[in-house]
Amino acid sequence: MNDERSFRKAQTKFILSSAIVYAFFYLTRKNLSMAQPGMLEEGVISTYAIGTMLSIHGIVYGLSRFVNGFWADRLNGRVFMTVGIALSALMNLLFGCTSLSILFAVFWVLNGWTQGMGFPPCAKMLTHWIHPKELATKMSLWNTSHSFGAVLALGLCSYLLHIGLGWRWCFIVPGALAALIAVFCFFCVKDSPAEAGVEELEIEGGKKEAESKATVTSSERRRLVFGNRVIWLIALANFFVYIVRFGFLDWGPTFLKQFKGIPVAKGGLMTIAFELAAVVGTIFAGWVTDKWFKGRGVRTCVFCMLFAALFSFGFWYLPSGAPIWQATLLLMGAGFCIYGPQALIGIIAANQATKEAAAMANGFTGIMGYLSTLVSGIGVAFIKTHYGWGAALCSFAVFALVGMMLFLCAWNSKATGYKK
């Protein structure tokens, strides 16, 4: 009983501490969306340049998650994560202090690589701390760090802009805060129950941590990931999930100002509402997966993507003169739905690949997700320039439906890849 109590206490501490650190990864990459309108107004960068920068950043981030997924399965997750957030802090500070367009691109692309050092170690550590039967619920709770990080970025940057500090401070202040969080990460996050000094988690059909490190080869890890049909399907679906998600998140304040005539500060608050609804949607999706679908997250994702398409279509159809509260509700509905699949894909991948290859599986699904920035970045910029924001918003609904169809193809898959 005492051992179980000690484990639960250490588990809770790990979930909270790692979630706090990951929220600051989000702070140091989603701050750009609030700085964009100011940068465009000053003329230091163009819409196409921002779109291109977002696309390249996303691709580099996806590659980083994929490559670092291999390393994170082998190295200490706490140290790996600490180095990542420290380097991201540095890139933000450098970005805020430059005025050259080429350096904007260089620092933000490098930030994309350092950002990819955040989730792979978390995916690995979470599977060592949480039993597969609880993973959907508890990892969904952990996954709200994405939304809280985005809310922190939007709220903090809205405040900095409101008091007249200018867009540069949207990078300098988050960079300084992230540097402090790197110290917190090194001392407070624990890689595994063994590092925290508590009993190791036992999983039926799984291996002890020491045994896993000693016996699982690179080829076996690759087989667990690339030989699994479900992982391929959810990776492809993730491409479309992220188009919709980043379409709203990266361009939200900009299209609200240009398409709906809503000031940047109010647009930032509306995007915060989008993220807060995402927190509830993420937790609800995890609970539904464990309680209703017995761990089969792809079934939850099917319904989430269907309703995400409906809310995206509704936002496009809403007249320009409609009250702000109607636009806010539709944004919140889209956020509630789209973040469920975003969280569950990582959980499904970890369960399907087992804890022996969880980081590699999440690296693979991650790179597929962030290849979507070719569409959500420069693609959206192209559609907006030639056809207007209405066409761009309508396309989000179409992409959501394509993602839903891919999840449907995995409807009958088992909940995990562990051998019974």
Each model region followed by its residue ranges:
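Extracytoplasmic gate region of multi-pass secondary transporters
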Residues: 32-36, 228-283, 342, 376-377
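C-terminal ends and interior cores of transmembrane alpha-helices
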Residues: 86-99, 306-320
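Helix-loop-helix hairpin linking two adjacent transmembrane segments in secondary transporters
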Residues: 142-193
